Amino acid sequence: MKIWYQSYVDYENGKSYWDALRVHLDQSCASETTIDIRGITPFDSYAHPLVEFRCAREMICNAVQAEREGYDAVIVGHFQDAGLYEARAAVDIPVIALGEATMLYSCQLAQRLGIVTINPRFIPWFHHQINKYGLKDRVAGVHAMTFEPGQILEAYGSDKKAEEVRVLFEEQGKPLITAGIDALIPGGGIPMLLFSKFYNHTIETAPVINGIPIAVKMAEMAISLKRQTGQGVSRTSDYAKAPQEVIEEFLAHPKGL
């Protein structure tokens, strides 16, 4: 299996993160699976929907490129899943998203989930995302730390910064647990990977879910099932396949000119 892992960070600005991610992906996938990390430049450095929109467009183009280069699946390694539905409507290979995969799998581990994101400006986005996935009754709370995406990358080169992130995450997670949350999800691949060093990571018995290996395993499963059954996403509604000329137009006119 050959998988394209789409990070919303580029190597130039996230070298320590990419290096750690490379190791973690290799630990998470089957021995016969190859995962190639690809970035976005300029990277997602500021928490805002406009940045998500820009990065989503590039991700969709990259999903088309991945399919044309013979990849078996794409993983959107960005918890906000920006561009997910549009990418699925543009390609026939599986597109697995970090946020969706983590939330869906976590519903098998706990009845009530909580998310701790890195920045308060992401909270509205997450609520829209939760509603879109039909999980409003299961993901019952979203709290936030106070980092920009670019700032939290510094934790990969500083033990002091990493400890600061861990403490802030616990401070935001504990009130959710007190309110009845059964499991906590770090709202981003960057904090997920940062916390992956903690085996059976819990806060007051509530598991802290690392979604990166979940997304990898879901991608491998999607590839295997597609090979066995021939089935992919439904083309009747949200994922109706765009005509080829529309896809080519999208690729050729990034500014709509």
Residue ranges and their predicted role:
Residues V208-Q228:
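Short, flexible loop segments at boundaries between secondary-structure elements
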Residues L84-I96, L194-I214:
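Short acidic, glycine/proline-enriched helix-loop-strand junctions
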Residues K132-G189, S196:
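Active-site rim beta-loop-alpha module in soluble metabolic enzymes
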Residues Q6, R68-H78, G180-G189:
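Periplasmic-binding protein-like
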Residues I60-L109:
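Glycine/small-residue-rich loop that forms an oxyanion/phosphate-binding "nest" at active or ligand-binding sites
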Residues P49-Q65, E163-E171:
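Glycine-rich, highly charged phosphate/nucleotide-binding loops
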